[in-house]
Each structure stands twice: as structure tokens, then as C-alpha cells.
Amino acid sequence: MLTNADREQIIAQYQRGESDTGSPEVQVALLSARINDLQNHFKAHKADHHSRRGLIRMVNTRRKLLDYLKGKDLGRYTTLISQLGLRR
């Protein structure tokens, strides 16, 4: 589970302005951190199907945000993908 300190660190790393918390880069970075955290959870709890549904929903939301960013600004998209280590 992400702590508030982790969340603030991610926001500070990917924000575009002083008080930016809603840009696609920040949203994708936060979703990626939550997805990675849940993947570690599933290594220990293989039968947790309820949380798996939430994981799939987060992955789909992240994919939609990445598609939006790719159409809006390809440079920001490629930078974000390389920073997060996502394969697309």
C-alpha cells in the first residue's frame, strides 16, 4: 500500500507545475505504483479475485490515460514510458 510520503514523492517527481496533481503523467505514475504494489500482493494471495478485478480496472485506466497522452503529445508520452519502464 502506498503511503502518503510515497504518493507525495511520486507527485513531486512527475508534476509539470508547482501544484500539479492531475496531469496524465502524475496519474499514470500513481497508477503504476499502485499496480506494482498489487502485483506483489498477488504473489502472496493468489486467490484474491476481488482485488484482481480492481487491478484490471487500474490497468485499463492507465492504458486509457497513456493513449490520451500519446495522441496529445508524443514526446511527453515517450518520456513517461521510458521513466516508468513500461513496454508499449
UniProtKB/Swiss-Prot annotation:
The species this protein was found in: Psychrobacter cryohalolentis (strain ATCC BAA-1226 / DSM 17306 / VKM B-2378 / K5)
Gene3D superfamilies: 6.10.250.3130, S15/NS1, RNA-binding (1.10.287.10)
PROSITE patterns reported in the protein's UniProt record: RIBOSOMAL_S15
SUPFAM superfamilies: S15/NS1 RNA-binding domain
GO molecular function, one term: structural constituent of ribosome
Record's subunit section: Part of the 30S ribosomal subunit. Forms a bridge to the 50S subunit in the 70S ribosome, contacting the 23S rRNA.
Name under which the protein is recorded: Small ribosomal subunit protein uS15
UniProt-listed InterPro entries: Ribosomal_uS15, Ribosomal_uS15_bac-type, uS15_NS1_RNA-bd_sf
UniProt-listed Pfam families: Ribosomal_S15 (PF00312)
Family assignment from sequence similarity: Belongs to the universal ribosomal protein uS15 family.
Function: One of the primary rRNA binding proteins, it binds directly to 16S rRNA where it helps nucleate assembly of the platform of the 30S subunit by binding and bridging several RNA helices of the 16S rRNA.
Keyword vocabulary terms for this entry: Ribonucleoprotein, Ribosomal protein, RNA-binding, rRNA-binding
Gene Ontology CC: one annotated term: cytosolic small ribosomal subunit
GO BP of this protein: translation
